């Protein structure tokens, strides 16, 4: 027999032996299913048990929710985005390096991108905190563009008049 004749036999044997030694990964087990009409409140963590099941960790215990449609998974998880801490989001997918996560329609999670819809991002700020500052113009040094400065000098013909008219302190 030539090696060419043995190739299909060896390939089949290798596939059979190799396949039996590969560990099989099963979907993570969830708690017993509880039929709820609405997602529980104040939940602080979640896990996807398989493509169609989500388990919510709440103060009262772990509640499993198995939606009939995969689109409902997004709605269940996004209702608790306000209570997810940064560390919980990071532990879901550590390769994202504390960046927001994006929740796919079927429940899978990936690192968020700039063009993702904000309503399905986990760990993103809903608003940027800010504080109003009272501006006191006499204490602020304004930066003037060179073109604007030269126009004012040309118009007033004197540097000291230019400064007084424009109200700028040039450094």
Swiss-Prot record:
Q: Note whether Membrane occurs among the keywords.
A: yes
Q: Does the keyword Membrane apply?
A: yes
GO cellular component entries = membrane; virion membrane
Its gene name is UL128
- Say what the protein does: Plays a role in viral entry into host cells. Forms a pentameric complex at the surface of the viral envelope together with gH, gL, UL130 and UL131. This complex is required for entry in epithelial, endothelial and myeloid host cells. Mechanistically, engages host receptor(s) including neurophilin 2/NRP2 to mediate infection. Additionally, monomeric UL128 may interfere with certain inflammatory cytokines to increase infection and dissemination by blocking monocytes migration.
Q: Which GO terms describe its biological process?
A: entry receptor-mediated virion attachment to host cell; symbiont entry into host cell
UniProt keywords (A-Z) are:
Host-virus interaction, Membrane, Viral attachment to host cell, Viral attachment to host entry receptor, Virion, Virus entry into host cell
- What do we know about how this protein assembles, alone or with others? Forms the envelope pentamer complex (PC) composed of gH, gL, UL128, UL130, and UL131A. The pentamer interacts with host NRP2.
What is the protein name for this chain? Uncharacterized protein UL128
For this chain, the family text in UniProt reads: Belongs to the HHV-5 UL128 protein family.
């Amino acid at each position: 027999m030539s090696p060419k004749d043995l190739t299909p036999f060896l390939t089949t044997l290798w596939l059979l032996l190799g396949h039996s030694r590969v560990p099989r990964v099963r979907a993570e087990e969830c708690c017993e299913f509880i039929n709820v009409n609405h997602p529980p409140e104040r939940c602080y963590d979640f896990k996807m048990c398989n493509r169609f099941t989500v388990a919510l960790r709440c103060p009262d215990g772990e509640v499993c929710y198995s939606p009939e449609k995969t689109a409902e998974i997004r709605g269940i998880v996004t209702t608790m985005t306000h209570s997810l801490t940064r560390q919980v989001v990071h532990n879901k997918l550590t390769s994202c390096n504390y960046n927001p996560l994006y929740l796919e329609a079927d429940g899978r999670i990936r690192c968020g991108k700039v063009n993702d819809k904000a309503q399905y991002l986990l760990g993103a700020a809903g608003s940027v905190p800010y504080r109003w500052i009272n501006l006191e113009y006499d204490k602020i040094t304004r930066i003037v563009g060179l073109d604007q400065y030269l126009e004012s000098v040309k118009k007033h013909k004197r540097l000291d008049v230019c400064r007084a008219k424009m109200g700028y302190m040039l450094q």
